[in-house]
Amino acid sequence: MSTISVRNVTKKYGAVTAIPDLSLEVTKGEFIVLVGPSGCGKSTLLRMLAGLESITEGEVAIDGEVVNNMMPRQRNIAMVFQSYALYPHMTVAGNMGFSLKLDGADKAEVAERVNEVAKILALDSLLDRKPAQLSGGQRQRVAMGRSIVRDPSVFLFDEPLSNLDAKLRVQMRAEIKSLHNRLGTTIVYVTHDQIEAMTMADRIVVMNAGTIEQVGAPLDLYDQPANLFVAEFLGSPSMNLIDGTISDSGTVVLGSGLELSLGASLRAGAEVTLGIRPEYISLSDTGGMKARCMVTVIEPTGPATILVVEMGDEKVTIEVTGRVAHKVGDFIDIWMAKEHCHLFDTSSGIRLDQ
């Protein structure tokens, strides 16, 4: 396992700056997940760590050694792609042991290492099969096994589960996390799927437009988002964001006319955005701000029900456990838990209740 230091790294493609002055520290054995929308720079950053992309400015260090000018193979890093990139004419054993052969290992050493890793990944009964004879999940495990046999100091995963169906994604999430717990190798994992990020990471790095918006433990980011982007990006359904202004008495007045005191000390007339997650809005009197709303959408998911209601001109999403008797068009009362409300500066996006 290794430490990774990204220091003031910039990546430019001609006149276009994809990543401007980014810094990040990854500790030994940490499972870091880079998450963000498509085009935010997360895969570019991963490829710079691997040596597959040049660094325009700044430096990347592994265990304190700057690797900017090192070839990918010299960095002792293994990368797993979403495409698997398996050789179709080789068996599972052949694919897994190929890099060891390139390194000059003898047949006995290759076979021993391949068999050892195959047992860890439950591939020992599939070693004689070709990739075409495997399921998507099995092919992904072979791709992981091919990396593990090299005993790298860092694993890089670039959206490895994107091509799998929903059931396999859940299974592979658990397998990758279990593998990390067993091996203890430093992992940097890229995904656009926030569920993967929340369930797998020791720390999440939320990226947007080539910059880091926030870094922290999954639940810390979920409960205490630094800004509007993180608040809206993490969570499914996403956080409700409701426009408002600060009154002369310091309360938050929402567009619907509702008024809420959050104890914020802001100038009168300031434009703010109130944020509250769907699960913190109740259909029964639990205290907090009460509002009369009309139901516009009901989505039963089995264990929970998602409702979308109109509160004045705003649409608000609510998530409740179990099922509801309400119908579309019904008028209902809702209660927003004051202790779970966040206040953001509408212009800058920065959270104010920190």
Model regions: which residues?
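ABC ATPase nucleotide-binding domains
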Residues: 31, 72-229
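The feature captures the beta-strand-to-loop junction immediately N-terminal to the Walker
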Residues: 35-37
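Conserved coupling/switch loops of ABC nucleotide-binding domains, chiefly the family-specific signature
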Residues: 56-59, 109, 209, 341
